[in-house]
């Protein structure tokens, strides 16, 4: 059971690194910045933080 948790944590970390790498590649393209009143820039980090909190609460 303990090794399964460790494998799941490793898989989650790899997925987070992969998603952040994809986000950095997408950020290098020319695109207009969101307006200051838009919450679009905060959506992705908030999503990752929520998923990480739920996963750690579920595992531990």
Swiss-Prot record:
Expressed in reproductive tissues. Expressed in chalaza, funiculus, stigma, septum, style and transmitting tract. Residues 39-60 form a propeptide. The keyword Lipoprotein applies. Its main location: membrane. A lipid is attached at residue 38 (GPI-anchor amidated serine). The modification 4-hydroxyproline is found at residues 32, 34, 36. Contains 4-hydroxyproline; hydroxylated on Pro-32, Pro-34 and Pro-36. It comes from the Eukaryota. The modification Pyrrolidone carboxylic acid is found at residue 28. It is found in: Cell membrane. Glycans are attached at residues 32, 34, 36. InterPro entries: AGP3/12/13/14/21. Residues 1-27 form the signal peptide. GO terms for cellular component: plasma membrane; side of membrane. Keywords: Cell membrane, Glycoprotein, GPI-anchor, Hydroxylation, Lipoprotein, Membrane, Proteoglycan, Pyrrolidone carboxylic acid, Signal. Disulfide bonds: none annotated. It is a lipid-anchor; GPI-anchor. Proteoglycan that seems to be implicated in diverse developmental roles such as differentiation, cell-cell recognition, embryogenesis and programmed cell death. Belongs to the AG-peptide AGP family. This is Arabinogalactan protein 12.
